[in-house]
Amino acid sequence: MAEFVRAQIFGTTFEITSRYTDLQPVGMGAFGLVCSAKDQLTSQAVAIKKIMKPFSTPVLSKRTYRELKLLKHLRHENIISLSDIFISPLEDIYFVTELLGTDLHRLLTSRPLEKQFIQYFLYQILRGLKYVHSAGVVHRDLKPSNILVNENCDLKICDFGLARIQDPQMTGYVSTRYYRAPEIMLTWQKYDVEVDVWSAGCIFAEMLEGKPLFPGKDHVNQFSIITELLGTPPDDVIHTICSENTLRFVQSLPKRERQPLANKFKNAEPAAVDLLENMLVFDPKKRVRAEQALAHPYLAPYHDPTDEPVAEEKFDWSFNDADLPVDTWKIMMYSEILDYHNVDAAAQEGENGGS
């Protein structure tokens, strides 16, 4: 039985196994508190995320279960990886992942990025998205603060709690407004992996300019800012809007022409502008895919088709439509955690030659 120790962080009880020491608060999210710590077993710095009251409601239980399943399934250099998970005696859940020193939001607010860093960061974002999308997963909430970076400029995408299945009927909006694809914002009926490419395009533009590309005050203002630059959406795209109110709003706007992005990004090289043009397209069907974007000339210094892996198997979303009571989610969660530790123990035994 693991020994647990308690610490008070921001008035919150952190109850962790004695394997972890030197707890320091890193950040507070909507669903949990994150601390850095030292892993006594590996001597590595780690991030420990406490999921607050994961079993308080069926919705929270399902969200936590989804994040756990995704973290277990997604294994890629540009995706944050799970190194431990446990349930404390108080029945809080703790995810332990690798610790990266900063995130893209902090980098962007501290100084302008040089060209080679912009290229390398965008390459890694798209490399991660290619893998995630091949697993049948859409992140849906890609933004600079969800993109972690270490001192070697290695980049990892995190926070898959809002991720959803690739589903033609996906609806609702979840991502931070500035980076939200128009098909989510306008509640068009269908959206898919292309929403992440739009978000990546907004992040790319922010790296080039040093400030958000579409800083809308609300949804109406956001859409207006987008059309000022990209013009009015084509009619065939407008007709995919399901909400009558949204459709009337879009049709009431003055017609605008798309502006050449080269006029706005005067300091960017033509190849960068060309890739951005292909990422920020109203029609999701005409928006470049992550795999195609990786092969764009702008990313030629890093592109290596033999080192841009896809997922070995699709993620199993069969649980996602389930409407289950908290106790059932809890049993499923315990089962997943036991499975994680059994698989982990077997892998370590294999590495040690079965000794």
UniProtKB/Swiss-Prot annotation:
It is found in: Cytoplasm; Nucleus. A motif (TXY) lies at residues 171-173. ATP binds at residues 26-34, 49. The modification Phosphothreonine is found at residue 171. GO terms for molecular function: ATP binding; MAP kinase activity; metal ion binding; protein serine kinase activity; protein serine/threonine kinase activity. The keyword Kinase applies. The modification Phosphotyrosine is found at residue 173. Activated by tyrosine and threonine phosphorylation. The active site is at 141 (proton acceptor). Its cofactor is Mg(2+). It is an enzyme of class 2 (transferase). Its main location: cytoplasm. Residues 20-299 form the Protein kinase domain. The keyword Signal does not apply. PANTHER family: MITOGEN-ACTIVATED PROTEIN KINASE. Belongs to the protein kinase superfamily. Ser/Thr protein kinase family. MAP kinase subfamily. HOG1 sub-subfamily. This is Mitogen-activated protein kinase HOG1. The lineage of its organism: Eukaryota, Fungi, Dikarya, Ascomycota, Pezizomycotina. The gene is HOG1.
